[in-house]
From Swiss-Prot:
It comes from Lymnaea stagnalis (Great pond snail). Its cofactor is heme. Abundantly expressed in the female gonadotropic hormone producing dorsal bodies. Its EC number is 1.14.-.-. Heme binds at C493. InterPro entries: CYP11_CYP27_families, Cyt_P450, Cyt_P450_CS, Cyt_P450_E_grp-I, Cyt_P450_sf. One of its GO terms (molecular function) is oxidoreductase activity, acting on paired donors, with incorporation or reduction of molecular oxygen. Gene3D superfamilies: Cytochrome P450. This is Cytochrome P450 10. It comes from the Eukaryota.
């Protein structure tokens, strides 16, 4: 027994071993006193002292936290309501109970916790602990309090893998000045509408080929077997035009072996990442079966990304054209090394393929379930064609109000990222409580987007709520909160403009060519790192006459 205790104690010390190599990164290390014992984060921290030896009075009420207007008294952090948990593991064991909360339904957990505890609550799940905000106004205050280097919680398994392998952390997981340097270079190319729209013609050609492929792969019922995988192929082919300005080979009768390998490993990557995000990071002590799977998928994805970058690197140095694809732009800019560019390209391919395909399948599902919305979109496209002598460019398709509204409404109902977050840089008041610097704060997007006090008829599909022509008087704070699915501020999703352009073009072209219907049991969301359907989405694609 004594030997076992010694082993457990040693293991926990290793898990919480300080990270002395990253002194500029703000890490969420704010424990809260529960049941007389401080809840300890198992994240690598910058505290040289073992947390087990620290006083349980690590955090006390902070007197210099700024109060919100109208607040008469700010409550201490320890009084934030939330589910009771055990020392060290918090509520982790609850998630393994048959009738307990599930990691695959974390978005529903946030929603139900908010109904139980209110617009602000605290929970510790294993090594992951955070304050969850369900008020647009309160989270808006956090957004406006950001500094030059906003700190977002790193995706620990990815960061740990890359550090172990000696790879660049990438713009997604890096922090501080290093993040800012890379972000500044890339955002000039990726977040300007004018830059992204330069590739609308190529993306339109990809969408045309995708529509042809859908016609080819329809079964006898008019359905697309493995629609989600077909959307993976389309998203990968489309992002390739922006990253490399070349076709990868996903949409032919035979998908290229490289594309098949990448897609298969990408699916495995996200499925293994999800459980690693919340469980105790035991993979830092020994290589678990799940970690080995994640590592293998990551190795393969990195290898493909590296090969694509190396293939384009030297030819790019010869290019001097104005509308450079991303790698050419980065090579000619000269601010990032090959290693950094590889990390960035892999991040973009991972995010672009999974995010865009998941969002698009939800859009198609909503259109198939709501023929009246589908018809309005078709009429809008038809009228726009009539005004342009029967033709309409991919760039013009991106400007159609209804297709934009359909995408916004879909992401409200099925936010692919069910939460967005920050590690706050300084003590502040949120929801009437003192929140210490370094605390991880998340916005409960899924819960807010389905709150009837914020969005009337929240379970329905009402794209009209986003149309200015309807005289919508949506509150400015609520409207801005609705876009948090793409992140916010300086750390907004780099691929947002590209993903929106891809979806606007492709959805319009699909509705131009097909009538969609869905005649099966309702699809429910499930969490595979992102919000994805819990079953194959069997939509009937009926060619229009």
């Amino acid at each position: 027994m004594a030997i076992m205790k010694k082993f457990i104690h040693h293991s926990l010390k290793q898990l919480i071993k300080p990270n002395l190599t990253s002194t500029k990164r703000v890490v969420s290390t704010s424990p809260r006193k529960e049941q007389g014992v401080a809840a300890i984060s198992l994240e690598p921290s910058e505290m040289a002292q073992c947390p087990f030896r620290k006083s349980i009075d690590t955090f006390t009420e902070t007197t210099n936290a700024v109060k919100a207007p109208g607040m008469t008294e700010v409550q201490p952090f320890e009084r934030i309501p939330g589910p009771k948990g055990l020392p060290i593991v918090g509520t982790l064991f609850d998630y393994f109970k048959k009738d307990g909360p599930k990691f695959s339904k974390m978005f529903e957990v946030y929603r139900q916790r908010a109904l139980e505890f209110g617009n602000i609550y605290y929970e510790k799940v294993g090594h992951f602990h955070c304050v969850v905000i369900s008020s647009p106004g309160e989270y808006s205050r956090l957004v406006h309090a950001e500094r030059q280097y906003p700190n977002r919680r790193e995706m620990v398994p990815i960061a740990y893998y890359r550090k172990q392998k000696g790879f660049d952390l990438g713009v997604v997981n890096s922090q501080g000045e290093e993040w800012y340097r890379q972000r500044t270079v890339v955002s000039k190319k990726m977040l300007k509408l004018a830059e992204v729209s330069n590739f609308s013609t190529q993306m339109g050609e990809v969408s045309d080929d995708f529509v042809k492929r859908l016609s080819h792969v329809r079964d006898s019922h008019g359905e697309i077997p493995a629609l989600e995988r077909e959307l993976f192929k389309w998203a990968m082919e489309s992002i390739g035009t922006f990253l490399f300005e070349e076709r990868i080979g996903c949409l032919g009768q035979e998908t290229s072996p490289m594309a098949q390998t990448f897609i298969a490993n990408l699916e495995g990557f996200f499925k293994t990442l999800q459980p690693l995000m919340y469980n105790l990071p035991t993979y830092k002590l020994w290589s678990t079966k799940l970690w080995k799977q994640f590592e293998n998928y990551s190795d393969n994805v990195i290898d493909i990304g590296r090969s694509l970058v190396e293939k384009k690197w030297h030819p790019c140095k010869m290019e001097v054209t104005q509308n450079l694809h991303l790698i050419s732009y980065l090579v000619n800019n000269g601010s990032m090394s090959t290693k950094e560019v590889t990390g960035l390209i892999v991040d973009l391919m991972l995010a672009a393929v999974e995010t865009t395909s998941s969002a698009t399948v939800w859009c198609l599902y909503n259109l198939a379930k709501n023929p009246q919305v589908q018809e309005k979109l078709f009429q809008e496209i038809t009228e726009a064609q009539a005004k342009n002598n029967g033709t309409i460019s991919a760039e013009d398709l991106c400007k159609l109000p209804m297709v934009k509204a359909v995408v916004k409404e879909t992401l409200r109902l099925y936010p692919i990222t069910y939460s967005t977050s920050r590690n706050i840089a300084e003590d502040m008041e949120l929801g009437g409580y003192t929140i210490p610097a370094g605390t991880h704060v998340q916005a409960n997007l899924y819960g807010m987007y389905r709150d009837p006090s914020l969005f009337p008829e929240p379970e329905g599909i009402l794209p009209e709520r986003w149309l200015r022509m309807n005289g919508s008087q949506m509150d400015a704070t609520i409207k801005s909160t609705s876009q948090l699915v793409w992140g916010h501020g300086a750390r907004m999703c780099l691929g947002r403009r590209i993903a929106e352009q891809e979806m606007h073009i492709t959805l319009s072209k699909i509705i131009q060519n097909f009538t969609l219907s869905y005649n099966h049991d309702d699809v429910e969301p499930i969490l595979n790192t992102m919000l994805t359907p819990d079953r194959p989405v069997r939509i009937e694609f009926k060619p229009r006459q």
